[in-house]
């Protein structure tokens, strides 16, 4: 096995206290435990192929948490940490572990209705000025991640901006996130 692409996830948004516990459990099961199970299943095969790679889809939500997406963000932070830890653990076996951290990608998931709104997520994002990246950008980033040396590969302008702000001016992100949250309430 040359590459296993661990790409599964679902998001159930809304205020933390309003999201049913079974939705939290489902996100944990799919977004984090699913990635763990995929890694467990793949390791015996990846370790037999020098230069192989486990590629996990993380998310830009694994860069900085967002109100209304608390458990989703927590699962993506978990994938980020798992990726970093396994990259260290599996290196002696010749296995690289990488992640993709996409922001908003032009897929049908954006056509779903935003939490607490009658508009699609796509409409909400466009109105807020967020970039929606084409799926081809993800394919290019996946190849770059598999062949490259970086543990995490950001996908899309929004992910790059978020990573920059989180590193250099995290207080600004927090203020903007709180303003956005206040506007929703």
Stretch-by-stretch model annotation:
Residues 17, 66-70:
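Active-site loop immediately N-terminal to the catalytic Tyr-X3-Lys motif
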Residues 64, 85-96:
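Active-site-adjacent segment of SDR/Rossmann-fold oxidoreductases
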Residues 39, 75:
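Active-site helix of classical SDR
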Residues 92-157:
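SDR active-site lid
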């Amino acid at each position: 096995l040359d590459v296993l692409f661990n790409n599964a996830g679902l998001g159930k948004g809304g205020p933390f206290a309003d999201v049913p516990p079974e939705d939290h459990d489902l996100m944990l099961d799919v977004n984090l435990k699913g990635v763990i199970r995929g890694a467990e299943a793949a390791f015996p095969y990846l370790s037999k192929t020098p230069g192989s790679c486990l590629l996990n889809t993380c998310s830009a939500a694994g860069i900085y948490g967002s109100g209304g997406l608390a458990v989703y963000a927590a699962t993506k932070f978990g994938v980020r940490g798992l990726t970093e830890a396994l990259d260290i653990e599996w290196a002696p076996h010749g296995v690289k572990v990488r992640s993709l951290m996409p922001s908003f990608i032009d897929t049908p998931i954006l056509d779903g209705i935003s939490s607490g709104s009658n508009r699609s997520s796509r409409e909400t994002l466009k109105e807020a000025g967020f970039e929606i990246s084409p799926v081809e950008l993800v394919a290019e980033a996946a190849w770059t991640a598999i062949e490259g040396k970086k543990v995490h590969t950001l996908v899309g302008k929004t992910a790059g901006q978020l990573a920059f702000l989180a590193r250099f001016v995290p207080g600004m992100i927090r203020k903007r996130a709180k303003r956005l949250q206040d506007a929703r309430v």
